[in-house]
Amino acid sequence: MMSNENFDNDYNLPPPNDSAEDLKIFIERYERSVDSTLLEIDENKREALEKNILRKDRKMKYEIECNERLQGWKKLAIEREISEEQSGEVQFPRWIDEWANTKLGGIFERIFSKMDSMQNDMNSRFDAMQNEMTSMKGEMAEMKVEMVEMKRETIRLNTRIDLLEQKTEARFQSIEQRFNSIDQRFDSMEQRLDSMDQKMETIDARSCRSIMLTRKLENATRSDQGYLASPVPFLNGNEPVSSGLPPIERVEDIDELSKEQCVQYLKGYGITFSPAETIKLKKRLRDTVGLWSKASTEYEFHQFH
């Protein structure tokens, strides 16, 4: 006979008797109890894992939300700094340099590349719209020529119809009234086309200013990273080199300009200045093309030759 101590267990199962059948029943009960305990442990682990995943998901969403807010606030700070710089001589803060070097890296490069691509796409669409407007004007001119010819034919008909009865005269007068109405419609269409031309010119001006500001910001980043500055187009969309001006790639290039060249640059960018200014003209031009690095802002300009 076996000792009951050999069948001690954590489930308070009674020990079997000396028969083999009773021992098998005891073993089956013990196995079911163990399986139930393991399932319960696995279920607890699964619930703990799900809670951990939910916590990580909430943490990640919170971090993303906070980062988006920070990026938005930082972008707003940059825009305000640029706006203040354009409205007056505001010293560009040094924390922008540190922030650009430590946080942005190549992000500005990619952003400006996408903005240039979007700007090129907008320019292509504007060019297509202008071509369509030109085509429409040509068709309008042809239609007006045809209308003039139709009027001449109407006058000839009226001369002949004067010999006919008065009833027929009334009908042709009605035709003339219709032609006058058509003329008025064409005049109205011409006015609308002229208005659209003015809007297109306004859009072109805004587009050029947008390109100018974009290139200015790009040069600020390139200057901080030690790269040569890219050419900043004038407000009319022309490149400075097309006007016979030397390119500006670094602050030393500005120092080598003559006063006439410096004035021509500032006028192209729409910058106001006093004719009596000398070195300040160079500083204005430096800030306008985006040479905002510490080395550029601390550079000592010389008088014009």
Swiss-Prot record:
InterPro entries: Mug135-like_C. This is UPF0612 protein C337.02c. It comes from the Eukaryota. Keywords: Coiled coil. Belongs to the UPF0612 family. Pfam families: Mug135_C. Residues 27-63, 120-207 form a coiled coil. The keyword Coiled coil applies.
